A protein has these predicted regions:
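C-terminal output helix
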Residues: 95, 113-122, 126, 130, ...
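A short, hydrophobic beta-strand element within the central beta-sheet of small alpha/beta folds
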Residues: 9, 55, 79-92
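Two-component/phosphorelay signaling modules centered on CheY-like receiver
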Residues: 15-34
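Alpha4 helix (beta4-alpha4-beta5 surface) of REC/receiver domains from two-component response regulators
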Residues: 22, 67, 81, 92-107, ...
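The feature encodes the CheY-like receiver
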Residues: 61-64, 89, 93
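CheY-like receiver
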Residues: 127-168
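Active-site beta3 strand of CheY-like receiver
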Residues: 49-55
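Helix N-cap/capping motif at the beta->alpha junctions
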Residues: 35-44, 65
Length: 168
């Protein structure tokens, strides 16, 4: 994998965490690393430069990671609605993971982060990308991770409203 070709945006209000992630990414060979202190600053960076991957903290102010991803995915003037997002947090409760998933996060990484964890999530994004789904109340990567070979119908969930558009 050519990590040296990736453009990665780090969004975290903690400078030490951005430094740690930068060192891990540089050790992998990533050369184009951009930084933002919160979601609002990240949106500004994305208006100027297209990123391959966004790594964002969940808990930041004034615009936290969930709100940032919601804007990234759903705002009419979003600069990168299809950008893959890895959410990083020390608050990895099931509720927070579900919030991140429902906001449109591609991958979730719990703190403390390790180089192995970062590599694994980046590899998942690149080698196993998920198609994007748009339905009445969600836009983002397909939240279903398992494939059921016995499934033959168009819906996986009973009661799915409306038409689902697949976007690549």
């Amino acid at each position: 994998m050519r990590f040296d070709l990736l453009k990665i945006l780090l969004v975290d209000d903690n400078q030490h965490m951005r430094m740690l992630l930068t060192e891990i990414l540089r050790a992998l060979g990533v050369r184009q690393i951009y930084e933002a202190m919160d979601g609002a600053e990240a949106l500004q960076v994305l208006r100027e430069t297209q990123m391959d991957i966004i790594m964002t903290d969940l808990t930041m102010g004034p615009l936290d990671g969930i709100d940032f991803v919601n804007l990234l995915r759903n705002s009419p003037d979003s600069p990168s609605p299809f950008a893959p997002v890895i959410m990083i947090t020390g608050h990895s409760t099931m509720r927070r993971v579900a919030e991140a998933r429902d906001a449109g996060v591609n991958e979730f990484l719990a703190k403390p982060v390790t180089a192995r964890g970062v590599i694994h999530r980046i590899n998942l994004l690149i080698e196993h990308p998920r198609q994007y789904i748009r339905c009445q109340d969600y836009f983002g990567p397909d939240r279903r991770r398992r494939q059921d070979p016995a499934f033959t119908g168009p819906w996986r969930r009973q009661g799915d409203p409306g038409v689902v558009e697949l976007q690549y």
